[in-house]
Amino acid sequence: MKKIFLEYLNELIYMLKEYENSWWAEWMEKAYIKYRDENDIDKFLRAFGGMGSFSDSIFKNDCTDLIKTITSNMGYEINKNGYTDVYEILDRIVKYDISWIKECTENNRDISYYQENEKRLAFFSYLLENYVPGNLHEINTAYLEQSQNKSR
């Protein structure tokens, strides 16, 4: 599972460099090295605490935030349990988004309440269906291209 967390963290770093022009990329690179070399998750988790933290970041590319969501969940599970399962995390997020969309539609809420969740659900479902260890960058890139083509 260490390899999978590092793959997701590496993809997050790529997204930060490629789409966000964010100084957080450097922080995450240091966290990557710290975890890879020393199994120390603390540098990564410290990015999420307090005002102005990585949690508060607003990204230009929606997929950056979605990869951040998965990676942060993995980091917290590693810290708590010593391991993580990306498929369980994706499944949990998909179930949450489905229940939120269902609740919104049953209560006749405006589409704006759940429109973002529909996008999240599409991305997380795509990962759940297509991800195998080692192919994250490839399928994320394909998803980004597909999304950009739809918006044109």
Where are these regions (language model features)?
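Alpha-helical interaction segments
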Residues: 13-17, 44, 89-90
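Residue-level recognition of alpha-helical structural elements
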Residues: 1, 5, 17, 24, ...
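Amphipathic, interaction-prone secondary-structure segments
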Residues: 24-59
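Secondary-structure edge/capping motif, primarily at the C-terminal ends of alpha-helices
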Residues: 16-19, 35-39, 104, 108
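Amphipathic alpha-helical binding modules
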Residues: 49-152
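Short terminal alpha-helical segments
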Residues: 1-31, 120-149
